[in-house]
Design a protein with these regions (language model features):
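Terminal helix-turn-helix DNA-binding modules in bacterial transcription factors
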Residues: 83-122, 144-145
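All-alpha amphipathic helical-bundle segments outside canonical DNA-binding/catalytic cores
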Residues: 2-14
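Charge-rich, low-complexity intrinsically disordered segments
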Residues: 60-90, 95
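Residues within helix-turn-helix
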Residues: 64, 75, 111-114, 124-125, ...
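Basic, amphipathic alpha-helical hairpins
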Residues: 1-5, 21-31, 48-62, 81, ...
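…primarily DNA-binding HTH/wHTH and HhH modules…
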Residues: 129-145
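Short hydrophobic/aromatic patch on the recognition helix
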Residues: 77-78, 126-127, 131
Length: 145
């Protein structure tokens, strides 16, 4: 039994070493293939980020939430967004939320307070501050134009 455990351990170790050797050979001999694969993965993750964002932007505006849902770190999400969009994840989130709020202001009769509640702001003053920072105007001014 002990001899079999040693054989299994040795086999695992050899397989692990083989994978390390293959990885280093691939990186040395085919760097462009690996770079393209990383680009494709980044684009795929960015697409998933955008899908999650559109579904959840009414409730959640934190970068960590989206990174967790994608099973990546906030730093890696930042790197992906920067490569694909040349913007941070927070800038993308805020931009999507601001555009959604614009839609609500244009297409509904909901009060600012109700829109703030819909987008999970503490109260209407937080929404107004956010909206002014993003657009340069108050929600009421935007609605009235």
């Amino acid at each position: 039994n002990c001899d079999e455990a040693n054989k299994t351990s040795t086999l695992r170790s050899n397989i692990y070493n083989l994978f390390i050797l293959l990885d280093s050979e691939m990186r040395r001999n085919f760097p462009s293939i690996l770079q393209n694969k990383e680009k494709d993965r980044g684009r795929m993750l960015f697409g998933k980020f955008m899908t999650l964002l559109v579904k959840n932007c009414h409730e959640v505006r934190e970068v960590a939430y989206y990174a967790d849902r994608l099973c990546i770190t906030k730093d890696y999400l930042y790197k992906i967004c920067n490569k694909v969009e040349h913007r941070t994840p927070k800038e993308i989130i805020d931009n999507i939320v601001a555009n959604e709020i614009k839609q609500y202001l244009s297409d509904t009769e909901l009060s600012i307070k109700d829109i703030a509640r819909t987008f999970n702001f503490e109260d209407s003053s937080y929404l107004a501050r956010f909206f002014r920072r993003m657009t340069g105007m108050s929600p009421l001014d935007y609605r009235g134009r």
